[in-house]
């Protein structure tokens, strides 16, 4: 409006001045911003999908770039989720094999079921006919496994077979305290080697107390080969990784160390009942954690100012996934409920995919900052050139052959610059690759898109381009003529935009 009034004052009321003012108004507003922003997000989400990370909520893209803590499950995320029995330690191997088959919901023929139970069946099938054993000893009643009691019971005509965590079954054995303590120590020693230790027991009728010990099953779920490198990359990026698992503390610590995670401080679900929020922040590995306790871990980390990405696969994980800044669900073994509330779904259930998603999230954010810096700096330079150019032409008395005031750029030139040399480079910047994004710490969650350095870039480059263009407009008319000076100014502005795109 000010330039329109200035034009009327100097040039008089004319259609040329109005057209020029309208063109400048169009150029001053970055109308291509919504399209470029949408394209940047869409292409970034598409790149994530190619890397097996499906974004369910676009807000997660921004949050991924700010993640400071990843709270990850162990089984299937850090490990291959392929349980194989390494050894059966039993005083009664025949009955222990029956327990492995009968206290089991998996189906070996179809491969359906929990990976641990499938591993038990694969091992038992070496020594007996699984289907024949199940036909001869039908299930009469059962108590399904639950994270609250940590064991499963199945009653058959032979009696009750139980399998579960050592700490859940050993106290139920008909053994003196000294013998129970020895079994606890033995289970802990095996777990410290990275084995998942499963206890087996037998009881008469439907008894769950006074049981007979059938032995330990040692299973191994090897870490995914790509996880150690992914952990190293994300730690270098300033993101802390903590393990949250339902497994034995010693097993969890062994796996954490094997993949390169910190594992100095280990706490169990029972410890969480007494730990303060400040003490909780120091824990590296959370073991024997119930799903509902994940929510408290997330809230304590967020209370300390952390931006948390939490993984989960069960129905009971939903509150923690919803509360986390980035809820990450498993696409292969996750429940429908967990996938519904999550912000990000891992198609391969792989920890390395979380790191890839964080890398893409940071890259998308940096690209948005780049094209914002570019668009605002170019728009600022155009406004300054036109506004100050009119003043300069009026002061120097620069007029064309028809006696009209020499404008720095014509309306058509302004629109051409705005369409071609503003919009297209901005689109290119939205697709830029940023290979070093994981070499820097996470950005603060509340940091603005145009931060201090970005604003300085906009002001300095905008003023520099405008100053150089005005210099051409001031000195060239005497040497090459008014029209050539105007043309040179236009070409400088057009080519200069492309040059400064590299600096954005």
Walk through the language-model features, giving the residues of each.
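Cytosolic catalytic regions of ATP/NTP-dependent phosphoryl-transfer enzymes
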Residues: 63-213, 219, 232-233, 241, ...
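Membrane-embedded transport module
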Residues: 3, 7, 263-309, 324, ...
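Hydrophobic alpha-helical segments characteristic of transmembrane helices
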Residues: 1-51, 235, 242-248, 367, ...
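Bateman (tandem CBS) regulatory domains
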Residues: 18-22, 98-101, 209-217, 232-237, ...
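Juxtamembrane helix-loop transition segments at the membrane interface in multi-pass membrane proteins
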Residues: 16-17, 37-58, 83-88, 347, ...
């Amino acid at each position: 409006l000010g330039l329109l009034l200035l034009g009327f004052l100097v040039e008089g009321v004319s259609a040329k001045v109005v057209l020029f003012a309208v063109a400048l108004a169009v150029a001053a507003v970055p109308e291509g911003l919504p399209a470029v922003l949408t394209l940047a997000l869409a292409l970034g989400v598409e790149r994530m999908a190619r890397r097996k990370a499906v974004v369910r909520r676009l807000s997660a893209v921004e949050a991924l770039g700010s993640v400071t803590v990843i709270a990850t499950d162990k089984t299937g995320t850090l490990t291959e989720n392929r349980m194989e029995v390494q050894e059966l330690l039993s005083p009664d191997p025949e009955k222990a094999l029956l327990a492995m088959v009968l206290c089991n919901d998996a189906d070996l023929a179809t491969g359906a079921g929990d990976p641990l139970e499938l591993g038990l069946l694969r091992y038992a099938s070496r020594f007996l006919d699984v289907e024949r054993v199940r036909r001869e000893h039908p299930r009469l009643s059962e108590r399904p496994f639950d994270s609250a009691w940590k064991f499963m019971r199945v009653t058959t005509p032979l009696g009750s077979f139980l399998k579960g965590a050592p700490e859940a079954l050993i106290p139920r054995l008909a053994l003196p305290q000294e013998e129970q303590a020895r079994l606890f120590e033995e289970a802990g020693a095996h777990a410290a080697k990275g084995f998942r230790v499963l206890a087996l027991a037998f009881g008469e009728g439907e008894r769950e107390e006074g049981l007979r010990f059938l032995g330990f099953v040692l299973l191994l779920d090897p870490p995914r080969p790509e996880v150690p490198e992914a952990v190293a990359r994300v730690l270098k990026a300033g993101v802390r990784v903590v393990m949250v698992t339902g497994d034995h503390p010693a097993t969890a610590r062994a796996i954490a160390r094997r993949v390169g995670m910190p594992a100095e401080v280990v706490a169990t679900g029972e410890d969480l009942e007494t730990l303060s929020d400040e003490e909780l922040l120091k824990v590296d590995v959370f073991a024997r954690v119930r799903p509902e306790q994940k929510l408290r871990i997330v809230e304590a980390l967020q209370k300390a100012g952390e931006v948390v990405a939490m993984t989960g696969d069960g129905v009971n994980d939903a509150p923690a996934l919803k509360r986390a800044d980035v809820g990450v669900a498993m696409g292969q073994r996750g429940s429908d409920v967990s996938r519904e509330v999550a912000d990000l779904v891992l198609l391969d259930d792989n920890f390395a995919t979380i790191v890839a998603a964080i890398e893409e999230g940071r890259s998308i954010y940096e690209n948005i900052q780049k094209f914002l810096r570019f668009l605002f700096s170019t728009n600022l330079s155009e406004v300054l050139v036109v506004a100050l150019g009119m003043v300069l032409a009026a002061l120097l008395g620069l007029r064309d052959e028809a006696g009209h005031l020499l404008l720095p750029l014509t309306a058509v030139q302004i629109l051409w610059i705005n369409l071609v040399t503003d919009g297209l480079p901005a689109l290119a910047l939205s697709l830029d690759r940023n290979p070093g994004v994981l070499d820097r710490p996470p950005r603060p969650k509340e940091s603005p898109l145009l931060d201090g350095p970005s604003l300085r870039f906009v002001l300095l480059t905008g003023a520099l381009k405008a100053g150089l263009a005005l210099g051409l407009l001031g000195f060239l008319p005497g040497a090459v003529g008014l029209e050539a000076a105007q043309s040179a100014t236009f070409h400088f502005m057009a080519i200069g935009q492309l040059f400064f795109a590299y600096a954005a």
